[in-house]
């Protein structure tokens, strides 16, 4: 039991959230590099050459230079603790799509982490997608570390950036490092906690030229000249005006420790990784419909937060990503697949390093394992050693955009149905079958998703499909007795469809129609979100 507790205590499971182009993929690469997980960081700007960013592995992502699915990467990281001891953590990094069209996949990924790193572009500050994602984290009081990136560019002043984060995101900022100059004048950072100056070297392998002790170090004046005295005055003001770090406030999602750096130059990344391991919580307790599951419980529990089709086109596979919530997983163990009511032996689970995969011999609470899925596992499904649990809080959103699928080759209907069904099981799109026709209607939270589906249908399933506009304003899941649902079908069946799980959905042609239908059928609930479990 003590080895179980110590293994779980080593785990840190987090996601990186940001607006597109804030440098999230670059930061992900550099964290992996500092963790020793990759030999060469696949620099994003060189993406059209042979080297693609390690976490952007799907063909479409490589073409577009954006992350459209969530990747999972695990690596060990050895660091020195504040008291000088060596400590090894197991880091589980979940890379999430930064593009606004993939918010639903990102949302679900954020249900599988214990903390998050928010990347802010020093030039652009807080942007729209950052606000949305932080609000998602806030629903679960997820602890947030902040990395203000691109200090090597001419950006906004650090005080202005912190003020904006506090005002717009309504979260206290506690600066842990402070920049010395910006843009061409950027010389490094001062560490407010341990009174050290870390000097910037854009040509050094790790971005650092030297680390000096103390602000009063005469060496600082020799290297920085007049900037040294400016730094001392600025730090005195910062200490007086800013919040000091409060670990309880951080763990409750009320305060964010802030680090400054330049991911593309490797600068500030190692400090962030050290802080992530030092400050972020180990795996946390999880709510179910019947009780709270503690990570140190000896029996295995886990839930599916993501399904990905065709991670390896050679294998035509589907993988269910399972967050381990408690206990220890061992290869070959028999687990209850709660929703199916069946016990299954898991012999070929895998761990991830983007698309690289290894068979998992064991995994602990906080880890992410991949379970091969032959169509029986769905988002939100739970695996246990026998207890019929359901983890709560894994949502599905009503789509905002709808398209009807049309085939250029009518003989490919079966392949189209199979492709749409499998891609919908990933949860980024939803498939609806109207009761009154043979149409296949696709719904998504972002318009770009239809391009992704068309591309993947063509390249992974050999189906050439066109997505035409479909007269639908919104979708609502129907909640009520079978008799009440039948009444609605009798009167307005042309607007009722079945979703991928076989549940009834009302596809409203307009918001006015939805309001009138709700008034006519007050006994039915028209649900905008549905908990997958």
From Swiss-Prot:
InterPro entries assigned: EF-G-like_DII, EFG_III/V, G_TR_CS, P-loop_NTPase, PrfC, RF3_C, RF3_dom_3_sf, RF3_GTP-bd
Annotated residues for binding of GTP: 18-25, 95-99, 149-152
tr-type G domain segment(s): 9-284
GO cellular component terms, A-Z: cytosol
CDD domains membership: RF3, RF3_II, RF3_III
PROSITE patterns for this protein: G_TR_1 (PS00301), G_TR_2 (PS51722)
Protein name (Swiss-Prot/TrEMBL): Peptide chain release factor 3
